[in-house]
Design a protein with these regions (language model features):
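Extracellular, surface-exposed repeat/solenoid domains
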Residues: 1-4
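Outer membrane beta-barrel translocator domains of Type V secretion systems
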Residues: 7-191, 299-309
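Solvent-exposed, glycine/polar-rich loop segments of beta-barrel outer-membrane systems
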Residues: 72-74, 113-122, 153-169, 201-221, ...
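Outer membrane beta-barrel transmembrane domains
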Residues: 130, 185, 215-318
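Outer-membrane beta-barrel porins/channels
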Residues: 178, 192-196, 210
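Solvent-exposed flexible segments
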Residues: 181, 196-202
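Short, structured loop/turn "capping" segments at alpha-beta junctions
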Residues: 186-192, 202-206, 237-240
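Alpha-helical membrane segments in multi-pass integral membrane proteins
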Residues: 190-198, 223, 243-245
Length: 318
């Protein structure tokens, strides 16, 4: 059947396809969040380790991800993210506070597939800036938080209705809070227990596709919790291995839009990423000298988000 009141250009299912782009873009922003709050925080802490209080220490983290998103239909996403930060530590009575302004960039491509075979694809990229902070207490307890904002640009194309395409730009905001405790098991082994809350919001946009129909995209919001633990084993003074498990729950992640033609308007079917994801991670860190540190990691996910990701971390001291 056709979308009620929207004319015969769009079948009910087909109207969902252009909205899947919002799901891909929101996931890219979340992957940027994940990079910052894992490898980014580790890098910031390592960058200031052994350095003078107040000195500025640059670090870079990068990740590449291949994800399959269950949105009711599904989206395949390939994304690359990067953070560049400048870490500084401030000693206090409880331990030390690490703060770092960060610049972030991400780009990727996606393919969306509806159950009826409709296929759409496109590209996305974003850039933004933010601030991260982490209080590390001497007893192993820590608290952390971050704020980010920037612009996301996406495009879409599909053979729906004889061929449609569009470009879209929107502002995004993101924040997170976390706390955890690092427990020293012995002189070589630690376990880090943590809980984190993530919030990401991408503003809406109104676009016109080639058929003359308009899509009025609502703002999309992601609200996630993540509970996990990571075990780290110090192989030597300069080498460490880690392995971790985490459970993530997405409370929202729905993308809504109103489709309008000369015959009227109707809501497009809404893709949603609400649900649970399990995450496993493995990694290795090496400190070759006082001036340079390297980290490599891999992660896999199952559930609402399925896929694999890789990250690379570099620290430089001057």
């Amino acid at each position: 059947g056709t979308t009620p009141g929207a004319g015969s250009h769009y079948a009910d299912a087909d109207a969902k396809s252009p909205v899947e782009t919002q799901s891909a873009a929101l996931t890219m922003l979340n992957l940027g969040h994940d990079l910052l709050t894992t490898a980014g925080y580790e890098n910031a802490a390592l960058a200031v380790d052994g350095e003078e209080e107040g000195s500025v220490n640059p670090f870079i983290t990068m990740s590449a991800n291949n994800q399959k998103l269950d949105t009711g239909s599904h989206v395949d996403l390939k994304a690359w993210n990067m953070n560049l930060g400048f870490a500084k530590k401030i000693n206090n009575n409880s331990g030390k506070l690490i703060i770092a302004p960060v610049i972030e960039y991400g780009r990727g491509s996606y393919d969306s597939y509806l159950d009826n075979g409709t296929h759409g694809d496109g590209d996305a990229h974003f850039w933004g800036a933010g601030l991260m902070a982490k209080q590390l207490n001497d007893d192993g307890l820590y608290y952390e938080g971050s704020l980010r904002a920037g612009r996301m640009s996406t495009d879409y194309q599909s053979a729906v209705a004889g061929g449609i395409k569009y470009d879209s730009d929107a502002t995004y905001y993101a924040a997170h809070l976390g706390m955890g405790k690092v427990v020293q098991l012995n002189d070589k082994d630690t376990i880090d227990y943590y809980g984190k809350l993530f919030y990401t919001r991408q503003q809406g946009d109104k676009i016109t596709v080639g058929t003359g129909a308009t899509y009025d995209f609502d703002a999309t919001t992601s609200l996630r919790t993540r509970l996990g633990a990571r075990y780290t084993h110090q192989l030597s003074e300069k080498n460490a291995l880690y392995a971790g498990l985490a459970w993530q729950h997405e409370f929202d992640g729905e993308s809504n839009a109103i489709v309008a033609t000369t015959l009227g308007s109707a809501s497009a079917p809404a893709p949603s990423m609400k649900g649970d994801t399990g995450i496993m991670e493995l990694g290795w860190r090496v400190n070759n000298s006082d001036k340079f540190e390297l980290g490599l990691g891999v992660n896999g996910s199952v559930g609402k988000q399925k896929g694999v990701g890789f990250n690379l971390s570099l620290n430089f001291s001057f």
